[in-house]
UniProtKB/Swiss-Prot annotation:
<dbReference type="GO" id="GO:0005634">
    <property type="term" value="C:nucleus"/>
</dbReference>
<dbReference type="GO" id="GO:0005654">
    <property type="term" value="C:nucleoplasm"/>
</dbReference>
<keyword id="KW-1017">Isopeptide bond</keyword>
<dbReference type="InterPro" id="IPR036224">
    <property type="entry name" value="GINS_bundle-like_dom_sf"/>
</dbReference>
<protein>
    <recommendedName>
        <fullName>DNA replication complex GINS protein PSF2</fullName>
    </recommendedName>
</protein>
<feature type="modified residue" description="Phosphothreonine">
    <location>
        <position position="180"/>
    </location>
</feature>
<keyword id="KW-0597">Phosphoprotein</keyword>
<dbReference type="GO" id="GO:0000811">
    <property type="term" value="C:GINS complex"/>
</dbReference>
<keyword id="KW-0007">Acetylation</keyword>
<keyword id="KW-0539">Nucleus</keyword>
<dbReference type="InterPro" id="IPR007257">
    <property type="entry name" value="GINS_Psf2"/>
</dbReference>
<dbReference type="InterPro" id="IPR056784">
    <property type="entry name" value="PSF2_N"/>
</dbReference>
<comment type="similarity">
    <text>Belongs to the GINS2/PSF2 family.</text>
</comment>
<comment type="function">
    <text>Required for correct functioning of the GINS complex, a complex that plays an essential role in the initiation of DNA replication, and progression of DNA replication forks. GINS complex is a core component of CDC45-MCM-GINS (CMG) helicase, the molecular machine that unwinds template DNA during replication, and around which the replisome is built.</text>
</comment>
<keyword id="KW-0832">Ubl conjugation</keyword>
<feature type="cross-link" description="Glycyl lysine isopeptide (Lys-Gly) (interchain with G-Cter in SUMO2)">
    <location>
        <position position="109"/>
    </location>
</feature>
<keyword id="KW-0158">Chromosome</keyword>
């Protein structure tokens, strides 16, 4: 799975918009959306929110966790813990990127939020590298990676898979070969 596919999955996450138009319910395969009334908040998938925002049909409300104070606490907690801490959304990085690229005018302190999320991302990727290094040095057979997001796994997945394959090959080459010759005299 590549980054574009992960972003596609993230676009299905629900966000809140405040429409400036009236429309009855929309019946889609993924579920019903609406009704849309001017000034009344409604939850829609991110892909629709971005589309409506681009056509100036709504205002996007940032997710509850997309707040400078909350993100600072999460960043500090992530830095203090040795293990990966739960993220506010399984798609926190993709949501931040998409919302800030398409609706930064609707998000207070957008630049600070971008920096805080990038700090959390960098901290988590650094932890992942340290974990992978420790994993290789200890010659472990399996690892437990709780609280990683799909994008984080995707970012390091190729490297980890290749590293594990190389380790497997090295281990099988180092094991003593079993004798195939008979010991009969």
């Amino acid at each position: 799975m590549d980054a574009a596919e992960v972003e596609f999955l993230a676009e299905k996450e629900l966000v809140t918009i405040i429409p400036n138009f009236s429309l009855d319910k929309i019946y889609l395969i993924g579920g019903d959306l609406g009704p849309f009334n001017p000034g009344l908040p409604v939850e829609v998938p991110l892909w629709l929110a971005i589309n409506l925002k681009q056509r100036q049909k709504c205002r996007l409300l940032p997710p509850e966790w997309m707040d400078v104070e909350k993100l600072e606490k999460m960043r500090d907690h992530e830095r203090k813990e040795e293990t990966f801490t739960p993220m506010p959304s399984p798609y926190y990085m993709e949501l931040t990127k998409l919302l800030l690229n398409h609706a930064s005018d609707n998000i207070p302190k957008a630049d600070e939020i971008r920096t805080l999320v990038k700090d959390m991302w960098d901290t988590r990727i650094a932890k992942l590298r340290v974990s992978a290094d420790s994993f290789v040095r200890q010659q472990e057979a399996h690892a437990k990676l709780d609280n990683l997001t799909l994008m984080e796994i995707n970012t390091s997945g190729t490297f980890l898979t290749q590293a594990l394959n190389h380790m497997y090959k090295l281990r099988t080459n180092l094991q003593p070969l079993e004798s195939t010759q008979s010991q009969d005299f």
